[in-house]
Amino acid sequence: VHNIGHAARIIAYGDADVMVAGGAEKASTPLGVGGFGAARALSTRNDNPQAASRPWDKERDGFVLGDGAGMLVLEEYEHAKKRGAKIYAELVGFGMSSDAYHMTSPPENGAGAALAMANALRDAGIEASQIGYVNAHGTSTPAGDKAEAQAVKTIFGEAASRVLVSST
């Protein structure tokens, strides 16, 4: 996600008209599986993999490890219109944070996630009331779920229960 945000800023600053951005991760290595297993962060519901990862569920027991990659082509709006491109979405803001709280657990108050959301809202020049959906990390771990839920409550206040939240 950081690469996408940085690519959008490069375009916004006028340093490029088009950028390809994204990333890849391969965590399902012996070291990755062993580390997450030792941290008790992996779901043990191997008998029902479709329901194993359940962020924010009271019966959650961890996440399902997977690998993935994704790439996007970002293009300056007028440049895209000029060439007749089909425009799928507009990235209006980007935010990030890094709190270095703990190697695997966020602070309970979700300060880092709340700061990233606040930074994205500020960058976009919009209010939290204009947001209807949050794509969260959703690790299905007690510490991660609690921190993310608190971050959403911090940013959206009383409206937090009306904002749709899911995870990748």
Model-derived regions: residue spans:
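Active-site-proximal alpha-helical scaffold in enzymes
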Residues: 1-25, 64-85
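Conserved beta-ketoacyl condensing-enzyme motif
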Residues: 10, 24-35, 128-146
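Active-site/binding-pocket entry motifs
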Residues: 42, 96-97, 140
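Short, well-ordered, mixed-charge alpha-helical segments that flank or form enzyme active sites
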Residues: 2-3, 27-31, 100
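Short glycine/threonine-rich loop-to-helix capping motif typified by GTGT followed
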Residues: 101-110, 139-156
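Beta-strand segments within the central parallel beta-sheet cores of soluble alpha/beta enzyme folds
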Residues: 16-24, 86-94, 129-136, 163-168
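Condensing-enzyme catalytic core mediating Claisen C-C bond formation in acyl metabolism
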Residues: 47-126, 130-133
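Conserved catalytic cysteine-centered active-site region
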Residues: 1-6, 15, 38-64, 150-168
